[in-house]
Amino acid sequence: MESKVVALNRESRRWKKSSFNELLKRARNQKSTICNRFTRKNTPNILVTFTSRLTLLRPTFFNFACWHSAMEIFESMSFSVKFDKELLPIGRHGLTAGWLIESLGQLLNSDNIRNIKCSQLGTDGFVSQIMRVVIEFTNNQTKKYIVKMPETTNIKAALEKTTQQKMPEGADEQFIGGLTMFFNREVEYYAMEKIPGLRTPKCYHAQQWDNGKTTGAIVMQDLEGMVSVPYYESLNLQQIASIGSQMLNLHLFSIGMSDEWRQKFPFPMELIDTVSNMTDIVKLYVSRNPELEEGFSKVEKMYQDRELFTKVLRDSHKSLGIDDFLCHGDLWFYNLMWIPRKSGSEVASNHLGSIIDWQNVHTGNICEDFCHMLTFCCDTEIRRQAENTFLPYYYNQLKAKAVEAGKKLNLTLNQFLRAYRRNFIAHALHLPFIVSIMLCVKPADDEIVQKIRNQMSGALWSAAQFAVTSYVCVRVLKFLYIMCKSVLVHFITPKHDLDYLKDTWTVITGGTDGIGKAYIEELCKTRGLKKFYLIGRNIDKLNNTKKELVEQHGCEVMCHVHDFEKDDLSALPKDLETLDVGILINCAGIAPHIIGTLTELPEGLASKILRVNLMSAVKMTEMILPNMVKKKRGIIVNISSMTGWRRFRTSVLTRLAKLHYPSSPTPCQMNTEELEFVFSVSFQCSLLPRSPRMKLKKRTISSLSPLKTLPNKLSELSGLIGKSQRAVCNMMFRLPLEHCSPFGFSKYFSSLLLCSEFISIVLPLIKRRTRERIIRVFIISRLSIFVHFYHDFFLLNAIFQIKKFSCELNFLESFF
């Protein structure tokens, strides 16, 4: 073999010079793609095939193999169709026509293929290359396909043009991670069941992208003939209605969708990373358009708040109690394909033909796609008309269709519109980034182009100002709402009548100081209750409290020493199960001595907190509630951590790891869900207090200035300055007005707004009159306004899905 190669190489050198020009001339006459590549410059890299599979020849054998094959091909003056199919490249990523034919399989008869043409569409996306492949058959028929492949070239070029700076080496790697996830998400979408009635391109083949191993590609229907609306124009109301008819199918399918959809398409946090890192681009855009600086200064801080984007994009609907719906995620001009007004026209009609580009599909806010579309694709006038007329109409249509389909829509019109307003904020802030990329922020040389840009900028900042105005209005209204509720609680709402419980026992855990002791004083001094059963861990404090109650108020007191942190729950007195208990106050609680997340706390501290703060309330309620139900009377008061309703970021580690450890609204879920299920108990009220919007650094309690100026009496009762780190939050019995008057705090705070935030926790209205209530259950918040830490942890949310308390106890005790 080696001698044959040497001989053939000698032969090839003899005819190479004289035959080269003739070969090129004859190749051009054949108009063959592969022959046009035969030049001295690119010859060493050419692909030559002798079978149906491609082979990359080694350089040592190249001269002979290349020229010998070329001589055989050109001397016969014919090219095999098979040869052309294998070698025709599709795009820049190593795919060929042979790959396409193999992927389509039985959809094509490869023996009847006469010619294959490939061209790049001029409307490539930012993160993909789009190729149109035309296959001609011997019977004069043609088939057209679109091949979509992921790449970073376009987005990189757009950013370089925008910033007028060359991207640094390795910048591609920053895009590839997120791009891989998004592209593979679209592949998975096309692999799922087709959503009835939703117009999307047909997908013939899709393969996932594994960078460095497998080229990602999607082969789909060619929508040639359809058009898109240019991004510098606006959709009209008829077009918005046509889009709504398709969203109707998507949202109707989302009601009761399978868990597989939720698992495959969770909300992509990469989207949060993208929108929260766009400040520099927007600043550059504003700097080149000075008329925007005043408006931008009002929202600049919002761009730097990643938590804000997380709330309004991912969590805004959850806090409203709305289920997840499927979202397209990128519903804007170039992903909406329209039927043209007439054949061959480039003007879009009012009939939507197809929705493309599903790489950002996810579960989330039902209004997300409407926010995106109305913000990015409509001028101010059209958007406001759509908000006032289209959105309510769409909700009614969805509700009617759900009834027809036999599905239950757990959504009110008020929830729907509130979900829209919340999500709209993020898209209004995102719009300048997209506009700057589309316009490349460089001032236009043409006056007409600059006029169009100014119109777009006007629409952009109108949307942004609407978002900011909405935010300010909500804050003001919340402040007024809090003040009105506070006045109602302290001056209008009557005290609860406790006379029917005077002959029953009041059981209090943690009643020797702080909140628990404040309850005892209120009950015995002003409510006439004389029977108390105290449970605490300090025998001296228990005896002192007992002595004080007996000598000063003539109370009957029983005590039991129990440390919820160390003692087993089974050691609690059994007589509690048969004792005639009228009021149960679960007040025992501890707090960590350091600020940190679950992973940052010392070993064993989390278990102690769970045991004291959670299991004490669970076990005490389990023991006492059945007898209350039997006697058809009773009150349960649970003191909960403020962080049960608001989670705090406590460290840099949390931000780096993108972790959020929400504490559990411990007694709230237990009493509103589990007790009702187990004991068929109805509740008079439940309290979900709002938390202060205060971002405090890691400080000791005594270093916080508001604490030094609080009235002494309030400080004594609340225990804010001291070991207990608690505050009186007595909603059921109401402390005297001189201690908790909402107006008494204002002079001790630097602003009325801060005062309102404090009042929103200390003095919320909880009384809701209802019918046929047997057991009254109150959930009260223990303040953590000045020290933010986690009393409870994320795993409690899963624990409370268990329906029986015995199962809960066994699980937790084995866990500890």
UniProtKB/Swiss-Prot annotation:
Keyword NADP: yes
Key word S-adenosyl-L-methionine present: no
Classification via InterPro entries: CHK_kinase-like (IPR015897), Dhs-27 (IPR012877), Kinase-like_dom_sf (IPR011009), NAD(P)-bd_dom_sf (IPR036291), Oxido-Kinase-like_Enzymes (IPR052961), SDR_fam (IPR002347)
Pfam family, one: adh_short
Subcellular location: Membrane
Transmembrane segments: 743-763, 777-797
GO cellular component, one term: membrane
Record's bilayer topology term: Multi-pass membrane protein
EC number assigned by the record: 1.-.-.-
Binding site for substrate: 641
Keywords: Membrane, NADP, Oxidoreductase, Transmembrane, Transmembrane helix
Superkingdom to which the source organism belongs: Eukaryota
Main localization category: membrane
Molecular-function GO terms, alphabetical: oxidoreductase activity
Family in the record: Belongs to the short-chain dehydrogenases/reductases (SDR) family.
Protein name, UniProt field: Uncharacterized oxidoreductase dhs-27
UniProt source species: Caenorhabditis elegans
Gene symbol of the encoding locus: dhs-27
